[in-house]
Every structure is written in C-alpha cells, then in structure tokens.
Amino acid sequence: MKVTVLVGGVGGARFLLGVQHLLGLGQFARDDARDPDAHEVTAVVNVGDDTWMFGVRICPDLDTCMYTLGGGIDPDRGWGHRDETWHAKEELAAYGVQPDWFGLGDRDLATHLVRSQMLRAGYPLSQVTEALCDRWNPGARLLPASDDRSETHVVITDPDTDERRAIHFQEWWVRYRAKVPTHSFAFVGADKATTAPGVTDAIADADVVLLAPSNPVVSIGSILAIPGIRGALRSTSAKIIGYSPIIAGKPLRGMADECLSVIGVASTSEAVGRHYGARSGTGILDGWLVHEGDSAQIDGVEVEAVPLLMTDPATTAEMVRAGVRLAGVTL
C-alpha cells in the first residue's frame, strides 16, 4: 500500500510514527513481515518555516520529521536533537550576534551546515534532504513540498513602533509567540514555486492520501499554496482523508487557533473541515476525522468521530487505521 501524507512539524512527525507503527515500517519494522516492501510511505513536508539564520539554511519541519522517524528527536521538546548541547548558541550570544531569540543546538547545527554546504554547491533541497536521510534512515520518503523558496511571512503591528510590517513566520512564532496584533499571512515565493520532484507523483500514485492534524494555515495551508499540489489532490484517484487539529475547540498542539483567527476561521473541527472543503465541490477532502465528542457537517465529506489524541505511536496508529478504513482501503 502506498500512503502519502501532507505534514508539518512536531504533530506531523508524530502522526507519521503512527503510520509507520500501523504498517510495520521504520522503528516498528517486524522481523516476521511477509513482505517488508509491501508498504511505502511518502511525506510531503511544509517548507514555509524554512529560513536562513546565522548563515545556514534551517528547515524545521523537515528536520523534525527526519529526527523523529530516525530516532534522534529530543523526546521532551518534540523538536531538535536528542542529547543536545548549546555551546555555539552561548558563543554567538557572547559576540552579540542577532537574532538573540533564536538558538541552534550544536548537534542540530551540523545538520544545517551540511544542508547549507550542499545548497550552495547547487544541489536542490530535495536531493539534500535525501542525502541527510541516508544518515537517519527514517523509513519513509521525506519530500520537501518544493525546492524553491516559499516562506511564510506574517503581517503584524510592531509592538515597538505601532506600525505594520511583515516578519518571517519564525520571528512571529518563536520571538512573539503569536501574541502580537496579526493581520495576515503571505506565502512569499509560493506563486513562482514548483513542486519538488516526486511530490505530484506521490499524490497521484497513492492508495490513500492523508492530511495530518498539522496547522491548517501555516503547515498544510503553506503546502497547498504551492502551484500544482491542490490540483494533484483534486485529480488523484486516491481518497483524501483529513484529521482535525482541533479538539473541543482547542488545538491539538501549537497555536493553530491563533492562525485560524487571523484568516477568519473558527477553532472548531467543522470550520476547519469546511475551510479545506469537499473534493466534490472545489475543495480537497473526501473524508474528515474529528475527535470523539466533536461533530461536523460538511457537504460532500464523510465525517467520522474517533479518538484523535496522539499519546503514543500505537494510539496514533489507530487514528491512521480509522482514516485508511474511511478511505475504503484494505490493509
């Protein structure tokens, strides 16, 4: 079975662990598997968070997925490298290097240095990611949504000057924690970007396409902003099943509610499902999973309520199983 998943960072990576647990891949590979090549997982990963910082290219969501599936993630934070140290960050601070609100761990820095060296040598991000994954063996194909620049920027009212300005998503998220007056999001470069090699084929050839319960605005929304992806979703023969990132009016994790508020979408499972829309209309969904106790009525979309708390890979695997079942695919 071929499963293609659209994902963001921490939540998306944990969802991918559930996919692998269900299919017996990656860390959950079984020695007695009849056919270890029977299943294939491809993750189309958000690149809107990517940025140059301290002279290196940082790809937070790609790295979080790579570290998580490769067993190198910091289990407490859910991002960054396990057993991290912060000597480089301390030295940069001692030199007074800005920005002082963003820190890179020493082990994590090695990843960024290798990536930046390869990018400067002319390799596209998709090839760089493949090379980095050779070290981690994540058990899934990780594809950046695009090799081109497609960064999420945020229009805010500057708290110091009271004037409107656009800042990179990382500054809004890390420095301001989304707690400044916010007016809009812009996917800079997305209109001129193209999908990375393999992305549209992964969607077209899939047996099922899953939208992880990642942020619908700055993760999934950023992916959908890249020309060609929405069209690939609308034309694939696979059923497209989405997972609500909202449980009882609150985000599963992160600050999805803050992002939804900016674009005028309520923080409910139904509102987010309607935001994605039905593929029978002009949207992208065939099915929509909401948390037990929640409900949603979306014309043209089959809705089912199941437990959506990703407490561990085994529990998350049952979420994935429910989505595959809703798509009518037999494991």
Swiss-Prot record:
Question: What binding partners and quaternary form does the record give?
Answer: Homodimer.
Q: Does the keyword Repeat apply?
A: no
Alphabetically ordered keywords of this record: Magnesium, Transferase
* HAMAP family to which the protein is assigned, alphabetical: CofD
Q: What class of enzyme is it?
A: transferase
Please list the reactions this protein catalyses. enolpyruvoyl-2-diphospho-5'-guanosine + 7,8-didemethyl-8-hydroxy-5-deazariboflavin = dehydro coenzyme F420-0 + GMP + H(+)
What protein name applies here? Phosphoenolpyruvate transferase
Concerning its family, UniProt says: Belongs to the CofD family.
Q: Where 7,8-didemethyl-8-hydroxy-5-deazariboflavin is bound, by residue?
A: D63
Its source organism is Mycobacterium sp. (strain JLS)
Q: Enumerate the InterPro entries for this protein.
A: CofD, CofD-like_dom_sf, FbiA/CofD
**What cofactors does this protein use?**
Mg(2+)
PANTHER family noted in UniProt:
2-PHOSPHO-L-LACTATE TRANSFERASE
Q: Which domain of life is it from?
A: Bacteria
EC number, UniProt record: 2.7.8.28
Involved pathway(s): Cofactor biosynthesis; coenzyme F420 biosynthesis
Any one Gene Ontology molecular-function term assigned to this protein's record: LPPG:FO 2-phospho-L-lactate transferase activity
Entry function? Catalyzes the transfer of the phosphoenolpyruvate moiety from enoylpyruvoyl-2-diphospho-5'-guanosine (EPPG) to 7,8-didemethyl-8-hydroxy-5-deazariboflavin (FO) with the formation of dehydro coenzyme F420-0 and GMP.
Recorded hits in Gene3D superfamilies, A to Z, give: CofD-like domain, CofD-like domains
